[in-house]
């Protein structure tokens, strides 16, 4: 399966437009949430125009800035609703990036509640990220409907066979690619 995912939503220009902490513009791209999301919507429309309809389009959002006066998960629900209207198939929910503030507590799955809330309230599929390392944890996130997809970053870099090992740990029968047979434990 091929898809287009846009990782630029976290700690990058698009998030700088979305966050009221960074966006101090006084034109059509600043001010209200609707105006701050204008740049993202224009990019989304341009990508959707050239991206095949049968392939999913994903957008990463930094769902909260974790500080007063910053982007909130409520804002992100509104953004996700608008993205859905513009052809986005899934919102990947991350957090932070504008200021050095950290979430109240960082631990396995600490961003999962963001994905769950956006999924439920915006009625759009979401992906969960953030210190998800155990196959059972990833499986539980999907099975309980907190997200539709779990994305791994650092864990996959540390353990490139994670998907194959996770499938085995969860009792799924998978065939390892022939080239990887010697790496199978």
Go through the PLM ranges and name each one.
Residues 1-185:
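Flavin-dependent oxidoreductase catalytic cores
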């Amino acid at each position: 399966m091929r898809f287009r995912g846009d990782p630029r939503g976290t700690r990058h220009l698009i998030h700088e437009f979305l966050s009221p902490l960074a966006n101090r513009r006084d034109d059509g791209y600043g001010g209200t949430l609707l105006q701050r999301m204008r740049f993202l919507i224009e990019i989304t429309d341009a990508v959707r125009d050239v991206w095949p309809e049968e392939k999913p389009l994903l957008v990463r959002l930094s769902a909260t800035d974790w500080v007063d006066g910053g982007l909130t998960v409520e804002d992100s629900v509104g953004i996700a609703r608008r993205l859905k209207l513009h052809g986005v198939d899934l919102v990947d929910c991350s957090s932070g990036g504008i200021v050095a503030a950290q979430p109240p507590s960082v631990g396995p799955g600490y961003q999962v509640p963001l994905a769950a809330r956006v999924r439920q309230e915006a009625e759009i599929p979401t992906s969960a990220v953030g210190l998800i390392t155990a196959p059972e944890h990833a499986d539980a996130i999907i099975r309980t409907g907190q997200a539709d997809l779990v994305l791994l970053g650092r864990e996959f870099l540390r353990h490139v066979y994670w998907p194959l090992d996770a499938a085995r740990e969860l009792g799924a029968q998978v065939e390892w690619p022939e080239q990887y047979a010697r790496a199978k434990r």
